[in-house]
């Protein structure tokens, strides 16, 4: 289902006596006497964080999670980040989750953060990575992945509710292996912003908490005390900051009850399974396998990749100039949301990598309005792009020719932050880690579980991840996954004096890349149902014909230097298949009653194979979607709070096809 895209309304700031004042909430962001000292006293000391951090285990898999209800100027985050690096164990990781319905525009944020030069190091990095302010979840990483920020833009209750598995407090705590360790309840005062202090929000906070979870807030309101108490927290008395008489500290004790109206059957998640060791086997050495290996290795896991070819990045990930661009839409659906979230995260990842490796270029790309349908689709974005020019700009024929460097027959949509990446080289970089072992020439035909670990070709690990593209449903356990093969052939042609002027990728019915090593990559065929990568001359001619339609005024070489074909794997809904793998027969039995009511509450998690996960079917957008999907999956395996909302976890879940079949019938 889709609905119109509703943009974020940014904060309306009025500067009074050089202090930021919210016109939406008729309240000040911070007082002249407050600022850093108030944040330190209320939130850091109120949650006893420094003492707790100093007692943490010293390993990469350990994550301390702080959640905040109002991001505001980001000061709390920056101060916490600075103190974490000073007092926490070197290898421990901080996950900071925050939310804002009306985030600050970047210029306002910069002005606010100039007030605290002692946080300038952290502030500079936050500003550099500050996201495009689109609704939903934004995941940012800092300090070599030691600090992560999940910034949720939207209504605080809706955003945090999406972090729940099911919304039933008893089952939620049975399923949950990851909890918030400390809460910063920071928002405009209860009298000015009641939604930030609602009973429903505190019920969600309780479901994301465990017995050691603490809460701190500057407020001493009886409304807040009552709401926290009703949610299962024990209130502790503490003097307020400065002249303020009181503030609230609390710790979570026990669950009481939750509304039956907001429960969701957790068909997408399994009951926790013990992992005796942090070891993982990954079948498949393409982009998906290499990204998930990298994400787990950064968390301290020992990873082994089994690849049937002679090196990584050979199959569908062998494109040396893979194009990165989003699928923009004025409508919000699981597909368009996942594509946008993924593009923004991937762009951040690749920008960081390009600082150290010559992997490609992110100088933009041009999606040509090559027919009336595409032109209409692009024109429908005009108001959306006025709000988010960082994502795309509509250009006419003259502008498109200037941007691309060559004469073009039409305008289009310029995506300024996109470009191309060398996928095989990226794979090599991702697995360059002492915790990652690669075994090549290793074809996997069966997988086995010995009641403790997974065993594949004589190699044993506690976790198994199937990232082998179109072959992912070759096993007995996975044969219910509806994966289709799509063959694509790229053609390499000699560059000419005229064609070398092309500066950015051009995409239309096909696509062409800027010259690299005196040649252009042109593509690509799209043969659904073809699972063999044999090369053929006809596809080269079709690619050249597409090229001529893209830029008919350019004298393109007809000299084919090389060609390459790969097999993409895709699902029926063109979203990837990522997450725990369900047992098909048991799933159908447990959830059979969904047939009569698809929204029926069933108090059972999905029956999944223990510690078996799928990470496949990324289609032709793997470069865009794989980084976020694998980072989420690594977090799930490592028992971390999700960086994706529940609705998107369900949208990419391997169980979605079984559920759909139950509801719709054979």
Swiss-Prot record:
User: Which cofactors are reported in the record for this sequence?
Assistant: FAD
The EC number(s) given in the record are 2.1.1.61, 1.5.-.-
Keyword Glycosyltransferase attributed? no
Reactions the enzyme catalyzes: 5-aminomethyl-2-thiouridine(34) in tRNA + S-adenosyl-L-methionine = 5-methylaminomethyl-2-thiouridine(34) in tRNA + S-adenosyl-L-homocysteine + H(+)
Alphabetical list of Gene3D superfamilies matching this protein: D-Amino Acid Oxidase, subunit A, domain 2 (3.30.9.10), FAD/NAD(P)-binding domain (3.50.50.60), Vaccinia Virus protein VP39 (3.40.50.150)
HAMAP family per the record?
Answer: MnmC (MF_01102)
Identify this protein by name.
tRNA 5-methylaminomethyl-2-thiouridine biosynthesis bifunctional protein MnmC
| Species of provenance | Legionella pneumophila subsp. pneumophila (strain Philadelphia 1 / ATCC 33152 / DSM 7513)
Q: Which gene encodes it?
A: mnmC
